[in-house]
Amino acid sequence: MQIIRVANAEEGGKKAFELIKEGMNNGAKVLGLATGSTPETLYKEMTASDVDFTEMTSVNLDEYVGLGGEDEQSYRYFMNKHLFDKKPFKETFVPNGKAEDLDAASAEYEKIIDAHPVDIQILGIGQNGHIGFNEPGTPLDSLTHVVELTESTINANKRYFDKVEDVPTRAVSMGIGSIMKGKKMILMAYGEAKAEAIKGMIDGPVTTDMPASALQNHQDVVVIIDDAAASKL
């Protein structure tokens, strides 16, 4: 793992975008994208730039079960608002959280991943070490699947909803094995709340108790963190 220390999330977004541009110059065509507050500074850099993404494909990590693209809390809505409406891509894929058969939709999404191999995967990390919505206990070879969200994840995401009861309890997520198929990983984390997870990911054993620790077995991982997130290393 390559660890890059930055002063703040704004600098982290700039650094991540530099790595994406470098990858695109070297032929990258597919970006794996994430949602939440962590990648927002990256998407600001992307939308403010003159870089053309119309030949790029994106594959998103996850989506809440029960929310469609018109729902403001859905991850499809988030991606459209923060990136795709401002910077068109050739194709954009987000899991279908409203599918009648979620298992079939998950298997179909895995086929999409295999048909569009991810060149650069953007990741955040949960306070419990989750990547995507792969909670502790998820098999490290897991593929796209339906996830029961933990109480800590629901509480971490309640700030996006009017009340905690409105937070979906399930999601469709790329599995850890799905994520590991990507050629290059860029994981960003900011703030003291992420320090324990960063320590476990980098210094701890590879274990299902810390899903992000699987990245120790990947050949090309860049970790972009501020001093607070790095404080327990």
Curated annotation (Swiss-Prot):
The protein's name in its UniProt record: Glucosamine-6-phosphate deaminase
Top-level taxon: Bacteria
Cross-referenced HAMAP family: GlcN6P_deamin
GO CC annotation terms, alphabetical: cytoplasm
Physiological role: Catalyzes the reversible isomerization-deamination of glucosamine 6-phosphate (GlcN6P) to form fructose 6-phosphate (Fru6P) and ammonium ion.
GO molecular function: glucosamine-6-phosphate deaminase activity; identical protein binding
Record's keyword terms, sorted: Carbohydrate metabolism, Hydrolase
Organism of origin: Enterococcus faecalis (strain ATCC 700802 / V583)
Alphabetical list of PANTHER family matching this protein: GLUCOSAMINE-6-PHOSPHATE ISOMERASE
Disulphide linkage map: none
Pathway assigned to this chain's UniProt record: Amino-sugar metabolism; N-acetylneuraminate degradation; D-fructose 6-phosphate from N-acetylneuraminate: step 5/5
Record: active site: 62, 128, 130, 135
Biological processes per GO annotation: carbohydrate metabolic process; glucosamine catabolic process; N-acetylglucosamine catabolic process; N-acetylneuraminate catabolic process
Family: Belongs to the glucosamine/galactosamine-6-phosphate isomerase family. NagB subfamily.
Entry EC no(s): 3.5.99.6
CDD domains: GlcN6P_deaminase
Catalytic activity: alpha-D-glucosamine 6-phosphate + H2O = beta-D-fructose 6-phosphate + NH4(+)
Pfam families (UniProt xref): Glucosamine_iso (PF01182)
